[in-house]
Every structure is written in structure tokens, then in C-alpha cells.
Amino acid sequence: MAFTQDLGSLPTTSFISRRVNESTFLVIEDDGYGEQPYIYIKIYKEFLLLTDTGCNNPRSTASSLTSLRQYLETYPVPQNRNQCLNPTGKKAYVVICSHCHYDHILGIPQFLSANTTIIASDFDKAFLLNDLDEHSLCKYVNVATPKYKIARWARHMNYFSLSGTAFRIQFLQTPGHTPDSLAWYDLDEHHLFVGDSFYERKRSKPIPELPDDAGQVPGLPATQAAIIFPEEGGNWIQYMASLDMLLSFVLHRNTELRHQNGLPHGPPPRVKVGCGHLTYEGDAENMIIEVRGLFERIIAGKVPVSGSGKKRGVIHDFWLESEKSKYSVMAPRHLAVEARKHFHGILKH
């Protein structure tokens, strides 16, 4: 049943919601891993389109409503006129997997009984079909790897429709964080969703309900919310190509918006970006340029390593230009070395 009658009797929950735009909501999980994944819910007449499903692991044992699906189907959201996002589960679910890491896929099993359509990138199917327990990092956090089938393999620049409904979204393959990293663009809301390809170190808009320690790496206290690359599939050469592609895409979309909505209508809208953590309505063009510039400086050796540590026997370095910086990076050292060799004499910085 939906909790819409007496708001004072609501159960405690591990989820927090915000409205992103007219059709889309952000749901943040206050999880036991300290990841605080950002889950996006776009509402259609007959469907709910989810970007990722979170950790299915509450931080507080006092929370009584800890299932994402139950939250969507029963819990009133203030920004939705105190109505739940999918009353009684009457709308079908479609899940876009931004990538396969545990903090984004552990909630999938609760949706399988609803005949959910699951979408993932077809850039490197083997990465998803083989050794998912390792590639998802589930084995390293001692949690069972979810079992699910990909119903649609997303091709680069393709659009998506299902059962006669055109979703008006466009897929963008963005390998780098992982081979299966998948972004998508909302044609109507002018919003780009990029998963864990990048995000800010700190929330530009505070979420008072959450502890402010997302993404802390144990043993390296300054690494909070670094843009992280795993040993399992991380690749800076692919990543830089993905940033170039995203920048070209966003520049084109912003040019379109200027032509369609320029003066005398006032400042035109610009493409916004929603990330897998910490950022849900940043300026896409500015953020991509800033992140790309940071990586160019790191690759050029102009940003010193701020700290190092070993994870699973592999040396990881941490880069932070200053405490005022919007971004930081943590990755296996060899990724920077390989990128430095590849881009030698090419990058501007």
C-alpha cells in the first residue's frame, strides 16, 4: 500500500529525493558502503525509466523502508505533490545501467519480478558477460553478485523505444571508467546523465539529510569523492576520447538550444549534467571542459601526486590540485603512465 494518508506515520527510509526537472527525479541512497549513489527516475505515461538501482544496503539499521522498488511504489515524495513515483507499481520499469559496479546494480534483483527491461552498453559485452563478480567489484565488498539478463544492448548514438513508446533519449558510449560506461541524453529536458565518468568533489547543492563523506577511500582521508578508476577495466586513453566525444556532443546541443531559444527570449537553456554521485544539475559543457583540463594537466605531469596507496596489490595515486579544487582523481598509477606515453606531444597543457 502507498503511504499517502498520514505523512506523520511514514516509515524511516534510506532514500532521499529531489526533483531534477519536469519529468525526472533524483533518488539518493544513504547506503552502508558510503557511496551515496545517485539514481535517476524519469516518469513516462506507462513506464518508469531508472538510471541504476543503488546498493540495496542501508547505512542505518533503523531504516525500515530500504527497498528502492518499495520506495518508488509506496513512499510519498514532497516534490511530487506528496504522491509516490509509481503508485502500486502500475508502470513498467526500464533500467539503464550506467556501468556494472556494485553500488549501481545491487538493487536490480528487486525489479526482476516486474518483467523489467534492463539496458547496458554493447561496447564490450564480454566485460559484462564474463567475470561479473570481479568486474562489478562485488567480490571485493563480499556481496553476492546480482544475476540478471540484459534485454537491450545500447549502441552508440542510438535512440530507444519500447512497446510503441519513443522514450526520446539517446545513448552515448563512454568507456574509460569502465568499458561498459554508458551515458544518455534526454532530448526534451536537455539533460545528460553520465554515471561515474565524472562528478564534483563536493555537492554544490547540500543535501542536509546525508552525511557529507561520500566516496571516502579508507586509509587515504583526502580522497573524498575522487573521480575513481578501478584496476578492473579503467582506461585513461579511452576516457579522454570519451570526454572529447561528450564535449563535441554537448557543444552541438548547446548551439541548437541557442538557435532555438536565443534573444529576445532571454538567455537560452543549456545542457545540464547528472552524475552517479554528488552532482545532478551541473553545467555539462563547463564540467566536461574542467575535467578534461584536469586530466590533461595530470597526464602532462603538471599536477603532483598528493598521495598513494595499494589496493589489491596495485599502486593507486591520488591527484588534487588544491583544497579549493572542484575535482580530484584516484587511479592505478599505470593508467597515467600509459596515457602519458600515448599522448606524448599531443595534449595542449
Task: Pin down the residues of each PLM region.
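Active-site-proximal loop/helix segment associated with metal-binding centers of metalloenzymes
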Residues: 122-156, 197-227, 288, 296-306
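Eukaryotic N-terminal targeting leaders
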Residues: 1-21, 25, 82-83, 256-263, ...
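Active-site HxH/HxHxD metal-binding segment of metal-dependent hydrolases
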Residues: 57-165, 198-200
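C-terminal regulatory/interaction regions
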Residues: 297-349
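Divalent metal-coordination and catalytic microenvironments
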Residues: 23, 42, 52, 99, ...
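Metallo-beta-lactamase
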Residues: 48-50, 55-57, 61-64, 159, ...
